[in-house]
């Protein structure tokens, strides 16, 4: 189910600048109230009956600049360290116009090998692989989402959250299993990963089984119904502190293919502008045919598109979340399209959530965001934490 890779290559190509992550704006909690009827508003200007009582939704918006301070990928990639962790990366390293070590980011094999090296060097992952044509995630940005939701949990307590007790659910874990890997290795979380694609579950399970650090920390569950998200995955006795999701972005396979081609063209144009030879690495490793852009960016149907696209997916996610309101402290999802934020917020307010967080994350020119919501008010969230 993972997608949002329409900006993935840009995020992978550029690591964060070395300046510290900082909060750009912070809006104080906003109490969202149901409007009084037109008649009442006209006659008194005030709410006059129980039907018009406040929905009392606490909405906080924040904007974060740069990668999180706990993100291991701030600054440029240390290729000496990466090659030491994964020697096979060496054959893919080239020089950029500034004479600095880099790779050809239009070569999927080079990007995949870079990911292996990053996971080995920073997360002690001894084995990581994904099937051909599956989504190869830009790890710095993916890791930042996990660090930001961890920060959300930390905001619930004085000091730090008891992360070693956290139970997390990743909707659409994908073949790469990236969010559980980061959550387990960086915070000691216990993760459940779900996916509709059997091959993704098989790949993720192999990654877990072949890494001692992940054994017993990640459970994979097959979603047997393409029409469900949480249903069939969250069991009656489950309790999750946090959920994560990178929802399908496109509305059709054709739209996904066009998006992949557009990203490939933009990437090559950007490389040429910088003086990088797009085919510079051909002599060292076979290049994917130009008429198969999906291989350069990766992604299967369930990862890239669904009927109605991102808007329809997160709308269904919101609706389903209501049935599990007492079993999850904070639901979260990435939202790629800014235009989808307001409708999602309005829908959540109608569903009766008590708190909403909208966190915008920017790294260079790339801007992403996630939305978090809870059906518990502050006192109820405190009680949840005290029972852990």
Swiss-Prot record:
Highest taxon of the lineage: Bacteria
Record region (Disordered): 1-51
Biased composition (Basic residues): 27-36
Group of enzyme by EC: transferase
Entry's Gene Ontology BP terms: rRNA base methylation
One Pfam family named in its UniProt record: Methyltransf_10
EC id: 2.1.1.181
GO cellular component: cytoplasm
Keyword terms, alphabetized: Cytoplasm, Methyltransferase, rRNA processing, S-adenosyl-L-methionine, Transferase
Reactions it catalyzes: adenosine(1618) in 23S rRNA + S-adenosyl-L-methionine = N(6)-methyladenosine(1618) in 23S rRNA + S-adenosyl-L-homocysteine + H(+)
Protein location: Cytoplasm
InterPro entries assigned: METTL16/RlmF (IPR010286), rRNA_lsu_MeTfrase_F (IPR016909), SAM-dependent_MTases_sf (IPR029063)
One Gene Ontology MF term: 23S rRNA (adenine(1618)-N(6))-methyltransferase activity
Biased composition (Polar residues): 1-22
Signal peptide: none
Family: Belongs to the methyltransferase superfamily. METTL16/RlmF family.
Function: Specifically methylates the adenine in position 1618 of 23S rRNA.
NCBIfam families xref list: PRK11727.1
Name of the protein this chain belongs to: Ribosomal RNA large subunit methyltransferase F
Natural source organism: Vibrio campbellii (strain ATCC BAA-1116)
Lineage: Bacteria, Pseudomonadati, Pseudomonadota, Gammaproteobacteria, Vibrionales
Gene this protein is translated from: rlmF
């Amino acid at each position: 189910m993972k997608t949002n890779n329409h900006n993935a290559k840009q995020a992978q190509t550029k690591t964060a600048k070395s300046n510290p992550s900082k909060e750009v704006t912070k809006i104080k909690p906003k109490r969202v109230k149901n409007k009084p009827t037109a008649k009442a508003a006209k006659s008194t200007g005030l709410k006059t009956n129980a039907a018009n009582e406040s929905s009392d939704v606490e909405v906080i918006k924040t904007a974060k600049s740069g990668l999180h301070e706990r993100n291991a990928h701030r600054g440029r990639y240390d290729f000496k360290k990466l090659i030491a962790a994964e020697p096979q990366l060496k054959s893919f390293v080239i020089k950029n116009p500034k004479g600095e070590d880099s790779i050809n980011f239009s070569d999927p094999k080079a990007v995949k090998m870079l990911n292996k090296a990053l996971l080995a060097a920073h997360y002690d992952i001894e084995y990581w692989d994904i099937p051909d044509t599956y989504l190869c995630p830009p790890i710095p940005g993916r890791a930042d989402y996990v660090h930001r939701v961890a920060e959300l949990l930390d905001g619930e307590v004085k000091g730090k959250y008891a992360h070693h007790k956290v139970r997390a659910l990743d909707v659409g874990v994908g073949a790469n299993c990236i969010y559980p890997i980061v959550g387990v290795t960086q915070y000691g979380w216990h993760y459940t990963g779900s996916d509709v694609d059997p091959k993704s579950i098989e790949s993720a399970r192999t990654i877990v089984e072949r890494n001692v650090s992940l054994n017993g920390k990640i459970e994979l569950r097959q979603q047997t119904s393409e029409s469900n998200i949480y249903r069939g995955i969250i069991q009656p006795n489950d309790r999750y502190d946090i959920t994560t999701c990178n929802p399908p972005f496109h509305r059709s396979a054709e739209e996904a293919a066009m998006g992949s081609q557009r990203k490939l063209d933009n990437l090559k144009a950007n490389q040429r502008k910088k003086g990088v030879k797009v085919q510079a690495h051909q002599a060292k490793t076979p290049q994917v045919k130009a008429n198969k852009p999906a291989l350069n960016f990766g992604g299967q149907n369930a990862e890239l598109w669904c009927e109605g696209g991102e808007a329809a997916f997160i709308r269904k996610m919101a609706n389903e979340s209501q049935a599990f309101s007492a079993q999850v402290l904070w639901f979260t999802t990435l939202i790629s399209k800014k235009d989808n934020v307001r409708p999602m917020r309005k829908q959540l307010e109608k569903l009766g959530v008590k708190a909403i967080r909208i966190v915008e994350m920017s790294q260079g020119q790339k801007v992403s965001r996630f939305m978090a919501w809870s059906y518990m008010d502050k006192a109820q969230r405190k009680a949840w934490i005290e029972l852990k």
